[in-house]
Amino acid sequence: MAAPSKQTAALTSPGYLVPFITVTALFFIFGFITILNMALVPHLRSIFDLPYAWAMLAESAFFLAYLVFASPTSRLIEAIGYKRTMVVSLFIQVVGCLMFVPAAKLVSFPLFLTAVFVVGAGVTALQTSANPYVSILGPEHSAPVRLTLAQALNSLGGAIAPLIAGAYILTDSTKLTKAAIADTVRLPYILIAAGLLLLGLAVAFSHLPAVTRTESFRPGKEGDGVLGTSIWSYKHTVLGALGIFFYVGVEVGLASIGVNYFLTQGVNSAKVASFFESLGGFGALVTRWLGPWTNVEIAAILVSLYWFGALVGRLLGSWILTKVKSGKLLGIFGFAAAAMVLLSMATTGQVAIWSLVLCGFFNSIMFPNIFTLGIAGLGPMTSKGSGLIMTAVVGGAVIPPLLGALADKVGIQNAFVLPIVCYLFIAYYGLWGSKPTRTAA
């Protein structure tokens, strides 16, 4: 067997491995909190009797934080470093989570949105610092693989969040008062705040090496990044930012509207229990577990499977990326996701439900690949490119309300034309738009 290369050894050496594991754990946190926030959409609809478009403002409040705080976070990283920025981001999230207590007590929609915005600010700072840190913490050629693995933990957090929401936040609105429904968020967010506080202290006292290679990092093929030029002159970076805009928007939009969509397609606990009962044996045990669950909780489980698909896809994708170029794989997954949404539009019942759930799998490798393709060849402009791309996460504040407004006007299924457009652009970027290029300054 050939000896491992220096790059491979560096990837698995203790000097990289322990920090990588530590920071990767943070990906679980912002994945969990981001998806838990999406559970507030059906929750707020129940409390305040909101149309889809207004309920989607919870997503807008969260992702607007990326527009406001992504660039300032880049400057904060330059001032205090990656580690301290991560700690600050966790403490900001603690404050945001605790703000849900007065919001629930007063049953105030503006306070709910404010709490969501503050949590979003903390997650923005964590994402902006953790993503490039993982990308540069090891050999340049394996940056997409490394970030895809880290994003797998993000997906795990996302897969667990709907289960927590279904069990402790989402309720049968016909059996509780508005105040009682609002109050269900208090305990979960208090516990999350306590966990984030402990994690922030743990990271503060951990040993994360100071990384000073940000300006010279060139993932993939080396380009001609020139310090002082405008980041807008790099076409592949600008298109990559647009790709992130569409990716985050469509992923968040589908997940946010998922509970309501699955209910319109006839999901109910009795049908699910009957299916497992017909399997006998282990199926009967599952039936006993599902029996007391409400229809809303079953729909939340399906949303959890949507995120679990992303987890499976990222674990599998980290291996596929060693065989297939990241741009090509991104294009294939983009077209496949568009096909799944189209199938869900054209059908009803179980086919419509499961084709949408499968979109989670095809979403899996999009973020890490768009991100690494977007900053490829930037050289000393890498930090600016990263800031631009992370700012584009604001797509999560734009696409979901548009999807909600379309759903109010033409119905949820007909509104799915918007996600199809988003996925087709992502496919275009992977196959044709991601080649590193710089226009004349």
What are these regions (language model features)?
Residues 37-41, 230-304:
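Extracytoplasmic gate region of multi-pass secondary transporters
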Residues 18-48, 254-262:
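Extracytoplasmic
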Residues 125-139, 364-379:
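Intracellular juxtamembrane helix-capping segments at the cytosolic ends
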Residues 142-170, 387-399:
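Glycine-rich segments within core transmembrane alpha-helices of 12-TM secondary carriers
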Residues 57-75, 304-316, 395:
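Central cavity-lining transmembrane alpha-helices of secondary-active solute carriers
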Residues 91-106, 335-348:
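C-terminal ends and interior cores of transmembrane alpha-helices
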Residues 69-82, 312-325, 407-408:
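Helix-to-loop junctions at the C-terminal end of transmembrane segments
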